[in-house]
Curated annotation (Swiss-Prot):
The lineage of its organism: Bacteria, Pseudomonadati, Pseudomonadota, Alphaproteobacteria, Hyphomicrobiales. Belongs to the GHMP kinase family. IspE subfamily. Pfam families: GHMP_kinases_C (PF08544), GHMP_kinases_N (PF00288). It catalyses: 4-CDP-2-C-methyl-D-erythritol + ATP = 4-CDP-2-C-methyl-D-erythritol 2-phosphate + ADP + H(+). ATP binds at residues 102-112. One of its GO terms (biological process) is isopentenyl diphosphate biosynthetic process, methylerythritol 4-phosphate pathway. The keyword Cell membrane does not apply. This is 4-diphosphocytidyl-2-C-methyl-D-erythritol kinase. Keywords: ATP-binding, Isoprene biosynthesis, Kinase, Nucleotide-binding, Transferase. It comes from Mesorhizobium japonicum (strain LMG 29417 / CECT 9101 / MAFF 303099) (Mesorhizobium loti (strain MAFF 303099)).
Length: 295
């Protein structure tokens, strides 16, 4: 473990649901899903350092919307790991969150922030805890946190906690667009007309831009129709992605962030610049996804 007491920064990658089928609902109300997800290089950043007392500050474009109380997932992650390890091994820390991802936007920003804090504090505190231990703590914080800890192409099933890594998955050129309309995940799930859809079809044996695009054409995001009914601006975001030349466009998660798939990173950058020039108040980011290889 790295025991450097100086500050270090961890990336909190955006989670993009390329496809998301809702396949059932448990007795406790949790929905069952079957989803292919990737994680982008663009996201939030978490800086951690040992300190005289616990401190939490937020900067970045979306900082004003971030709660600073104990309900924040960053602080929940800190406190959960401290309870697990014991206060004697977990001295005070300063946590600085750079919030670059929109709030309530369907890209797992809060869950990814929590995952970054768990990874970062495990190293800062030099804890003897493995990935499975962190995932167990992460699941107690939210169903998306374990997959955000993995941060590689994966298929998530169950409530999002049954994870299967996808090998030989190359990085993708992506453009993310959010029209500035927060969407309540609970409201989207409550508005679903059907909760017993079929699971995802088998993935192609060899995944490249073309095979993935063809596969995506026969999949869905089952949350998209409900989210569109709640926030019609999502349709405008998808329209702009298509106008900019996206090879495939869809809403991620429960929205309102949408993604466009592009064959190269340079094409994605040009498309993002075009959309940004027409919609300067929207969140628009060109990025690449993390591949299945170690990065």
């Amino acid at each position: 473990m790295d025991t450097d007491i100086g500050s270090r920064t961890w990336h909190a990658h955006a989670k993009i649901n390329l496809a998301l089928h809702v396949t059932g609902r448990r007795a406790d109300g949790y929905h069952l899903i079957d989803s292919l997800a990737v994680f982008t290089r663009f996201g939030d950043r978490v800086e951690i350092a040992l300190a005289d007392s616990d401190d939490f500050t937020v900067s970045g474009r979306y900082a004003p919307a971030v709660p600073l109380d104990a309900g924040n997932l960053v602080l929940k992650a800190r406190d959960a790991l401290r309870r697990e390890a014991g206060s004697g091994r977990t001295p005070p820390v300063s946590i600085k969150l750079e919030k670059n991802l929109p709030i309530a936007s369907g890209v797992g920003g809060g869950s990814s922030d929590a995952a970054a804090v768990l990874r970062g504090l495990a190293q800062t505190w030099a804890l003897d805890i493995d990935d499975a231990g962190l995932a167990r703590i992460g699941l107690s914080l939210g169903a998306d946190v374990p997959m955000c800890l993995a941060a590689k192409p994966l298929v998530a099933r169950g409530i999002g906690d049954e994870l299967s890594m996808v090998p030989d998955f190359s990085a993708l050129g992506l453009v993310l667009v959010n029209p500035g309309t927060p969407v309540s995940t609970a409201d989207v799930f409550a508005a679903l007309s059907r909760r017993d859809n079929e699971p995802l079809p088998p993935l192609p044996r060899s995944i490249d831009f073309h095979s993935l695009r063809n596969w995506l054409e026969v999949t869905r995001n089952d949350l998209e129709p409900a989210a569109l009914a709640l926030q019609p601006a999502i349709g405008r975001a998808l329209s702009w992605l298509n106008k900019a030349g996206s090879g495939f466009s869809r809403m991620s998660g429960s929205g309102a962030t949408c993604f466009g798939l592009f064959e190269t990173g340079n094409v994605a950058k040009r498309a993002a610049a075009e959309i940004r020039s027409r919609q300067p108040d929207w969140f628009v980011a060109a990025t690449r996804s993390m591949s299945s290889e170690a990065e």
